[in-house]
Each structure stands twice: as C-alpha cells, then as structure tokens.
C-alpha cells in the first residue's frame, strides 16, 4: 500500500471504517437491528454474536436458550422429548456423542484433530521410518550436493527412534532382521556334526554307507536352509555382545583396542583359571562324565578360544589316567609370597624382570602417644590462646652477678608482663641512648630476661583465673560452694565443736567468741533521748532495750534476763506488740540522714501519745543516725472523707467510728499529717494567748510578746492542704471560735467524734441551702443566740471539735489572736450594758485602745501574708471570698425573728451610737475621727449577726430577751438623765 510524499507524515488513529461491500448481509442486518433491539423489553431481547446469529447454549440437544428469558420463541422455552415405548415400537437406545452438543463452527474447529498414528510411535520402523530413509537416499543420489556421499540419517530423518530401538541396535540387532540367538544354532550344528562322526567310526560298512547317504541328504537340506539362515541371522554381531560386561569400564569401551598382545595375555590367564577351577570341582567323582576331554579329530588354533562346541559330549568311558588331582596351595600360603618374586617370567610378553632389584620394603612404626595426651579437645580462651601459642618456656638461666642489672631485668619483665608489648618497645627505644637496657637487644642478661618474662606472664595468667573451680557434673552443690558463689562471708567458728556437756568455762568462752563475732547495730550503741518511748517506766524501758538486743544482736543469751513472772501471758503478748511497733517507728525515723527540729518534735509527740502520756514540752534533739535500713511493707486502713462519700451519693462505711492515728511513713507525713491534738497543743503553747479579762497594761505586754514571737510562729506553722469544698461550704462562725486552753486535757477519740459531727452538720446545712436556692424555695431562718451567752462557755470537746474543723483550713496563730481580740471586744460590748454610768468613760477608753491594737495587728498580718508563698495567699483568698459570700447571704437572709425585732435592733444601734457620741464629747481622750465610728458600727453589726447554731431557743424566748433588754436600757437612760439633772 503506497502513499504519496505529502501523506508520509500523516498518522492514522482509530479503526478504519469498513466498506459496505466488504461486510456480509448478516452483518448489515445485525447493525440495522441493533438500534431496534435496544428499544424492546428485556424479555424480548435476544443475544446474538458478532456475526448476527443467535447465541447457542450448548447445555441441551436443542434450543438456543434454557430458560424463560431469551427463549427460542415460546414462553416455556426448550421442551424435552417424551419417552415412548411399546411392544411393536421399542424405544431405541440413543447414543450421545460430543457432536450432539456442538454447533457447526465447533465441529469445523475439531475436524482436524482426528486421532492418527505418527512416526513417533513407529517403534520398529518397518513402514514409515524405513520408507522415509529409502526415499531420502534416492533423492540424495539424484540431486547434486556440496557434501560428497550420502547425508547422515541424523540430518535427514527426524529423531523418531525410540530408546528401545537404540538399545537393540547397540546389542547387535539390525533393521529388518529377527531377534534370535545365533550362537544356539552354531552349537546345534556342532553337536550334529559330532554325532555324524561318531556313527561313522563305530558303525559297519553298510551302516557307513547309509550314514554317508543320510549325510549327503542332510547336506542338501542344510544347503537349502543355509541361504535362509544367512538372510535372517546376524552376521556382523560385535564381539562384546558375546561376552557379558564384567569390568568397571564404560559401555562399549575396549582398553586393549590398540594393544592386542595385552588382550591375548589376559584371555589366556582367564582360560587357565577356568580350567583349574573345573578340574578341582569335577574330577573328584568317578561317575561324572568326562566333560573335560576334547573330541578327537578337531584342531585348536593358537589364538582360538575353548568354547562349548569343542567338548566331546559323546565320549564314553572314564579317564582313569587323569585321576591324580593337583591340589592348589592354600590362599594364605600364596599370599605370604611376594608377587614379584613368584613371577619368574615377565608380566607381559615384551617385558622381562631384572636380575637385581633396588626396591626395598620399608616399614614405619606407629607414633608414640604421650602419657599426658587427652583425647578430648579443650577450647582455649583468647588470652590463653595467645599465651599458649607462643614459644615454649625458655630454659632456666642463672641470674647475672650484677645486682643492679638483675633488679632492672626483673622490674622490666614484670612491667612488660603486666602492661603489654608496647612497654618493651618503649624500653628498646630507650636502649639506644641508655646502655643499661642492652639485654633487650641480645645483650648481657638477655636469656635471664626471657625467663623472667615468661614466669611473670604465667603468674599473671594464674591470677586472672577465677578462684572458684567449677565442679564436675556429678558433684552436688553444697552450702559452702553456694556461699562462695553468692559472695557470702562465712562465720568464724571455733575449733572445738559445741556440745551440751561443755564445762562452764568453755561455755563462757564460746559465748564471748560469739559476742565478738557479731557486731552490734548502730541503733543499739545508745538510744537517743527522744527514741526512748518508755523512759517514764524504767522497767519497761529496760525490757524494750533487751527486746532490741534480742532482735538485732546474735550470740548466746539466757532465757530470762529480766524476770517477768509477775506479768500474765496476755500482758506479755500486748507488751511485745508495743515493743515491735516502737522498734518499727524508730527504724522508720532513721531513713534519712537529717531531719529538721519540727519533724522530730512531731515524731516525739506521736510516740508519747501512742505509748506513754507525757506533759513535757521541751524535747532534746540528738544527732541523726545514719544507718541505712531496707524498705518494709506496711498495711494501713484508708478511710474516705465524708464529703467524698456525700459527693458520690454513698453511705460512709466508717460513720461514727473514731479516727485511728496512722504511723508516719516519711518525713513529709510526719510534718503534714501529724496528730491534731499534738499540733494544737504546740500551737497553744507557743501562741501565748492573753486571758479573757485583762487590763490595758496586760494587753500591751501580750502584744509585745506576740510581736516578738511572730517569726518563730511563722516558721513553725505549716499550711495543710486546703479542701476546696470545706473552704467554700464551712460556716463563717468557725472563724470566731476560740481555742481550748492549754491546761485542759484532750481526748483524741472524743475530739474526732465531735469534729465529724460538726463537719457533717455543716455539710448538710450547706447542701440544703444550695438545694433550696436551685429549687427556688426560701431558706428557713436559723435560730439566734442569746445575747448573754458567750462562746467561752462551750465544753472542751466542742471547742476541740471546732478547732479541728478550723485546722482543716490552715489557721495560723495570727488568726487565733484576731479571733480572741474580737471575742474580747464582744464581751466588752455586752458588759457595757451592765456597767454603771460612772465607769462608762473608763470602758470607752479601754475599748478604743483595744481597737487600735487590733488594727495594728491586722496590718502586720496582712503585710506578712503578702510576703508568703503563692499557696498560702491562694488559700487565704479563697477563704476570704467564701466568708464574703456567706456574709452577703446572711445579710440577704436577715436576722431570724419578726419585723419588730429588726426594728428593735436598729433602734438599739442608734441609741448605742448616740451614747458613744455623748461619751466621746465628754471624754478628753476620745478620738473624734469618723473612721473609728464607722469601724465600731460594723463591728457591732457583726456582733448582732453572730449566733450559735447549736443553741436551742425559740423565737418567743428571743423576743422576750430583747424586750427585757430594751426595758433595761430605757431604765438606765432615765436614771442617767436624773443623775445629770441632779448634778446640774
């Protein structure tokens, strides 16, 4: 297909459109019906192939489809043939073939795959292969070729010869000939000829004539069949086929191909061995046939073999002259002679043995095994490998006479053996300038240096070996070996064995030896004063120290060093438990090297409370013990906080049960989680609180002492963790509670119970209040406190409980002072109503001085709080915010009582203000500043708002008290006016 020059650069994309005349009519019809077929419903559409023919499903004997959809033309589709059979018309057996399920195209495709015989399976080549070979040879003769002669069969005929044909051809078979043994025919012919000769010699004349006639006839018959046998018998059978393969050479290999003389020699030797073997085995009996004789009249060539046809099988009689048997010598005797000496003739025909041989047989003795030889191989370590592969030990050489040279050689050898070869190289470099080291360069003392170097190297290797030698697998691991492996130090035992029948002196000596072997622990060298928990009871303290000795000190000891016969078993067991607890506390106190004085003070307080009660306040702080102890496992009871149980809406499992004082587990635990009673006692003792009713001078002294001890108090006060819920929901009246006195006894069990009760009541009130606010309900008013009831009249247990609840908010000593000063002011304000008019001015002056002192103390405390840490400031700010929130709520809720009581309070405040105003105008010492009046007014309001939540008093009683107080105030005013009028 050619293109023009202009169209050479064009590229054709896509499939070219066929011409209409090239397509068949069926294809044109399929293209035309393609658009119509898409518009038909699914069940009417027919599947067609690329030629436009309907697709044929080859699943049945007929039909294009096998179902309802896309059927041949009926709704049912293909219908199978009905089975009919009768007597006249029997049902025929239909034989199905593969052509019943194929269409025309499939049959056309399979038409060329018929089964036929091929030349590949023509095993014997009688027909196809032979014909092809002959045809190829004829064609080769007719046409000229560059290769002269016939073409080999491997180039013309394909390789269709099977392996069986190849093997037969190797064995002597040829194409077109029968497979039979030609040697059997020759054997038969030889026997027949021998029979003829025997009859001719032993028969009569007539018989001989008949035999000649018969032989003549038989010769004719043989001549007739000879030509046939020559045609069908093998005439060119190889020699190696007659002789079976009995050597180790390859198939068809002849080692004597180019040396026929060696081949003849070998054949003669083999025939001689066979003859000797047959003579020994067959000539011993008289009844056996004379098979070893040869038939007379037959000559044997020099190079011919003695075959079966040469035997005289028809000979009669026995060979008596050959009865002597030559017995071959034994094999052992023949083996003793040398083979070369036994052969007088040459081994081969063309060789001769020399008269004198230079060959001498030499025998070598086996090597001698040394006595220290071990058949098992021992693998050496890298260091041993290097040392053992070195040269052997040098011989011993006497030391040089020069002492300085000998010392120098020994020192140099020791240094080289320890440090390595580089030290020797360094000394060799030094020998170039210093003649003393000439022994390193084959000088005087070289042999002695080599010997000493080897000795030091061996000594160094021996030192590097481990001390413990591995025992054999059969040895058992004893206690001593185990102790050595683990690095344990054995106890020093005395030479004499211990026995119960020792005299007294030997027993004392044994005990002293044991006491010297055991070292006393550091804790027993002398207990410090603060680590003697039973020092108030000397007998018990002595028993405790003996308990520590028995626990930590070994050796022999008497059964009862301290008599305890007066104690019962229960008391003795309880005392032992106390001793163990005390010893454990002392050990825990020695975990760290240093401990600050406050932690030692708290630890001593805990020990005193746990074992023996004591009122001593000053503790001696000894030096810290540096004994290291191992960690111990402890079990303690964890109790959830009541507020935690409330938040999770569960019942407190420990409700009403006293708190158990836990042992401090570390230094921080002893600081923070110290017993409340001990902390409160220390605070009370160090705060130096002034009494309730003090004079102006006494108050001044108390203020000076408090200012002097402020730094110490701040250093000893520890901020406990702030509970957020308690800081928010605790009552504001807790800040106004007073601490119990220092001289009152404290019961820790009762204190914990009261603290739980107060805390639960406060939490419940706060919860109800918050719930009422959320539901939009009014909060019920709290019951007021009588005006003549003071907080100092509370019981010690209640005060302790309130103190514990306040301690949970980390109250410092400065806050305690402020609360007490506020209480003093409230007492003065309450007592001013009952004071006569003559002492009003004195009380006012006293009140103003206390106010001034409280203001100064508050300013100092605020200044210290600004300098304190972030944690304290945050906790204090949270407390102030919670107090302001509660105060605002109380102002909104108002004072419980009727509206008349509120008006009564207001009138009372106005009267008190007018009274103070009058007193200020008459007092020469009064301060006329408005700020003091404002502060006093707020303080009085706080006093009126303060009430005790635990007091049970009805509203009626509250109103009556206020009415009586108002009547008393009116009477006092009238009496005061009378006195003024009288003075005038």
Curated annotation (Swiss-Prot):
InterPro entries: DUF1604 (IPR011666), G_patch_dom (IPR000467), Surp (IPR000061), SWAP/Surp_sf (IPR035967). Residues 882-892, 905-922, 934-946, 975-984 have a biased composition (Basic residues). Residues 679-695 have a biased composition (Polar residues). It comes from the Eukaryota. GO terms for biological process: miRNA processing; mRNA processing; phloem or xylem histogenesis; siRNA processing. It is found in: Nucleus. Residues 697-709 have a biased composition (Low complexity). Residues 160-202 form the G-patch domain. GO terms for cellular component: nucleus. SUPFAM superfamilies: Surp module (SWAP domain) (SSF109905). This is G patch domain-containing protein TGH homolog. It comes from Oryza sativa subsp. japonica (Rice).
